[in-house]
Amino acid sequence: MKKIYLQLVLTALSVVSIAQNINLQEDTTTNLYDSRQGSCAMSDIDNDGDLDLIITGADAQLTNRKTTLYSNDGLGNFTEIIGTGLSNWSEGGKIAFADVDGDADQDLLITGRDGSPNYYAHFYLNDGSGNFTPDTTQPFEPSIGGNLEFADIDNDGDLDLFMTGRDNNNLIFSKLYQNDGTGEFSEVTSTPFISEGGSASAFFDMDNDNDLDLILAGKNNNNQKNTTLYENDGAGNFTLVSNTPFENVSNAAIAIDDSDNDGDIDVLINGENEAFETICQLYLNDGTGAFNLLVGTPFIQTAVGTVDFADFDNDNDMDVLVSGSVAGQTFAAHIYENQGMNNFGLVDILETVYLSSTALGDIDNDNDLDAIIIGIAQLSNDIFKPRVYENMLTTLSNGTAVIGLKENIVLYPNPTAGNVNIQTEHTFATSIKIYNLIGELVFSQDNLNPNNQISLQQPSGIYMVVAKSMNSTSTSKLIIK
């Protein structure tokens, strides 16, 4: 009987022109504090050439709140930095790094609340070595439930700030702050932005005129859901764009990038629409700032989560990571490989989460993108544990990608008519979950028998197998004939 080592991902769908594949493996050795209703971000805070980590949030009981900075040793190992002086009032808020004063280091803005609850917006200046000092002179609105976006809106060479959320008076707002070039901000009045909570926003050049326009999604003070687009005139003056195709959503996330490599920026949005349905939709830009919905995408439809564009397999196109709650019932964290021209396929399923936050970057300096995800997990005993996923991508000399698992997962026979044996290289799998290509869980079993043989009564097709052992979690493809 032939055994197929799926770290090579040899399936009937293999195509010669596709030289890469995607597999992210959880590093179970990390020791990061639990985070409930928190946020995470990565940046090189000490200018040593690697990405450090910050995580905010509360513990499982919502009694203690913590903001923790972790130093990276360059290999993806994170150690808590003691005595940072950062406020622990950070539940329900956001994090943003930016060099606001032009001194070549990353400053820090954190929003959130304490247990009272009082809302906060704390800004810190970095001395270049990762030591942060509070700057209490800034006018930023204390808030939760919104978003923070630093960008140069007026082409003057410094970073301005767009901020949304809910303030201490329980009112939803959208505010723009202009940087004077030294890191001092002032609020811009009379902007056209709709006030949005449960919101997401992103700056991008929608029409290739060399200034940053803005897309904004969320719910206003009248509980009306909106997704709006604003055109920048180049001087930081914005005008609402009418008749856009975007579906109105709240509890949203937005990702922007050139998904089809045609030289313009496309938009990916998830959230809850006016019919209280979850969505995840990709809108293609024609190059002039006019957008059209791409129908037939396979993305799982979520809200209260994240969407990210990222080239996980180093093939020069944008793959997609989607997390969040599916219709308020199940959770998800799915990766879709872009096989060119927006031909997406589900290739990896991570620990399912909602109320999630993601941070993507090369944490171990091996030239691929890793992921850190926090949120409320559905299928794990460690519900609020931050999870670090290492990208196992390596490339052979002939250009064939190999998914380098911590332990090889063996499925046989594969393809199968229904019965399949599943084991890891050194230990038997302790649990198996199998999903179809639209992300539905079709099989789950714990405490497998010594032979790890299972019987599947599923239609013919391709399935994703998530196998957990004592030492690792691995994802592989299975074909049912």
PLM segments and residue spans:
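Blade-edge motifs of beta-propeller repeat domains
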Residues: 19-35, 71-90, 125-143, 178-196, ...
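Beta-propeller blade termini
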Residues: 38-47, 92-102, 145-155, 199-206, ...
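Acidic carboxylate motifs that coordinate Ca2+ or other divalent cations, activating on Asp/Glu
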Residues: 48, 52, 103, 107, ...
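Hydrophobic beta-strand segments that make up the repeating blades of beta-propeller
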Residues: 53-57, 108-112, 161-165, 214-218, ...
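Short glycine/acidic-enriched loop and turn motifs that connect beta-strands
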Residues: 58-62, 113-117, 166-170, 219-223, ...
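A short loop-to-beta-strand structural motif that recurs across blades of beta-propeller domains
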Residues: 66-70, 120-124, 173-177, 226-230, ...
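Blade-level signature of beta-propeller repeat domains, shared across WD40, Kelch, NHL, RCC1
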Residues: 357-397
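C-terminal outer-membrane/trafficking sorting elements
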Residues: 401-481
